Amino acid sequence: MPNLLEKTRKITSILQRSVDSLETELPYNTMASRLADIIDCNACIINGGGTLLGYAMKYKTNTDRVEEFFEAKQFPDTYVKAASRVYDTEANLSVENELTIFPVESKDTYPGGLTTIAPIYGGGMRLGSLIIWRNDDEFSDDDLILVEISSTVVGIQLLNLQTENLEDTIRKQTAVNMAINTLSYSEMKAVAAILGELDGNEGRLTASVIADRIGITRSVIVNALRKLESAGIIESRSLGMKGTYLKVINEGIFAKLKEF
């Protein structure tokens, strides 16, 4: 059987794999699955709001009611609030504890069920919780060491992703501000009219029709589109006689136009 060092290496190797986005469906399934295999348990990871980021079920313990929480990828508020008050790892909680992940209606089915909850921190902030559980058999000290390491690994990844997301948001806002500052009043008017024509973030438009409707020349619209495209705000493609296909790739422009 693998020793503690080998198990630790398997978990820390996940740091070498990037999680590209928290928007991805269940971005931490790999971590949960790896931990479940190594410790021989069920495992799940939730963020501070109770959103499920990943899980692995080696053993069936859920009722249909609880299974709905996993399918919805959202834990109930009462459980999330209780878990948020766990500041250090709470190990081997019985089915009678309020923090047990075993359904209340399954207490008689799994009388020896045990739950362990480890808080996930990053940069001094509480980012979520790592939860593991078994039908029986206590989690050993070695198991708990692996849980602590896993929560640290997830905390590092979550913090890095949040930092990257913040930097990306700042870059996009800066690009929008710079683009807006290059537009004349007429060009701003044209941009507002153009984006108002789109169906969501993309669509087809005819510059001459918009120009006639808002009382500007077609060249004003063309210049405005060129400035936005060069700033990386939009993508455009000529459709010939059918007009121009437009797609917004920096949605920050919509919020900025509300100030216009």
From Swiss-Prot:
Keyword vocabulary terms for this entry: Cytoplasm, DNA-binding, Repressor, Transcription, Transcription regulation
Region (GAF domain) location: 1-159
Single Gene Ontology BP annotation: negative regulation of DNA-templated transcription
This protein's GO CC annotations: cytoplasm
Keyword Cytoplasm: yes
DNA-binding residues (ranges): 207-226
Pfam families associated with the record: CodY (PF06018), HTH_CodY (PF08222)
Coiled coil (UniProt feature): none
Compartmental location: Cytoplasm
Keyword Repressor: yes
Functional summary from the UniProt entry: DNA-binding global transcriptional regulator which is involved in the adaptive response to starvation and acts by directly or indirectly controlling the expression of numerous genes in response to nutrient availability. During rapid exponential growth, CodY is highly active and represses genes whose products allow adaptation to nutrient depletion.
Family: Belongs to the CodY family.
Designated name of the protein: Global transcriptional regulator CodY
The species this protein was found in: Streptococcus pyogenes serotype M4 (strain MGAS10750)
Protein's gene: codY
